[in-house]
Amino acid sequence: MKIIALCCSLLVAATGLVRGATPVWPTFRGPNCSGVAADAKPPVKIGPTNAVLWKVPLPFSPSSPCIWGDRLFVTAFENNELQTRCYQRADGKLAWSRGVTVEELETFHRTESSPVASTPVTDGERVVTYFGSFGLICHDMQGTELWRHPLPMALSFGGYGTSTSPLISGNLVVVMRDRDEASSLLAVDLITGKKVWETARPDSFGSFGTPILWNNHGVAEVVVPGPLRLKGYELATGRENWVVEGITACACTTPVEGNGLLYFAAWSDGKADDPWATWEELLGKHDHNKDGVLSLDEFEEISRDYYRGFDVNRDGTVEKSDYDLLLASITKGENVLLAIEPGGRGNITQSHVAWKSTRGLPYVASPLLYDGRLYCFKNGGMISSFDAQTGKAFYLQERLNAEGYYYSSPVAADGRLYVASLPGKLTVIKAGGDQPEILHQVEFGERIHSSPAIAGTNLYLRTQSALYAFGEPAGR
């Protein structure tokens, strides 16, 4: 009976089905991280001075909003607290804020991340937040703490900081704990917070995507991106069921599923089209004392955390052997978009890849599956559209007049795609077609790392300094 319940929960999460008409966007990118709000109708012409229902100041974090009914949840780091905040969707008023403090914060990128980068997840009765410096903490919808599950500090690759978000299925909370050492996939009981299972991921030195749920021929699975490998684990037990090898070495995106297939797309530097510096070039730039070894204090402060991840043996220096080992790992994988068929067990790299593409690949922005098409947004402001079943490209790397990196992942509703560039330009695109049709573009005047959230007739967007709610005022 428990397995049946878990499979039913998986179906609900994957399709976005909810009781009645309660607006639900329960986690990062909404139902099962899909980015799709099937029945929502948010406005098109939104912006910092247009269709704004409310706006509240919010400390910077790449974390995105999640929604259940009249409640909206976000994270914030303020007054040395790792905070879970609850806002009223109707007017933006703060309903409650609960924080935890730690003796030491995880290492994180000072301009591109924060110690509260993970998006909360809710089932309508509880909200669970993951902090890399603390672990998991659960509150009810009124802010009462129900349990906490402390964990060892996350040690992210390159010192970027934690970005993965937890998921809920049935009575399980699942979180990926890919670290520089002792990586694992962890499941705890939603009611008690106690560990149910934990599966080691010894070949995963760090990744930044979020796991999703997949009904793989009747088996409820957790699909987890990682360096060089995409894996599927049995939800009930944590057992590894299958692996696809040869993907990019630095997985920053989240998979999506639908149309009977599973999709993953990612890109990272270090390949022939964007090679890393040679060891000699790195020494020439940073080896100020000319000793042939790079100590961390020889790097500029803003890049020190990044290069700390290159110190493989943890002796406080980066040596040629460290760098060569990382370079060899980075160059192994392929920057690729994959469509994976269900039913496989073991290594399915050769047997269950339905189609693949190596163009138009995203770096951080996850792919979007919508109305039979798969969309990818490449850094520089380029969109590609593929037939989700066959992989045929309707168009490739078409420019959107919105340059820059894309850390925010696209979302879709009512026949439209919404995507924001890191410099702060939001673009609304008509879904479908042989060419992208831009319906609206607007500059926010500040950077956007977070992904939009959609509920009913509203769209919510977190910028560098604020949280916006967009929609038409009541009575119009």
Which positions does each model-derived feature cover?
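Bacterial N-terminal signal peptides
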Residues: 5-16
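Noncatalytic, solvent-exposed loop/strand surfaces
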Residues: 18-476
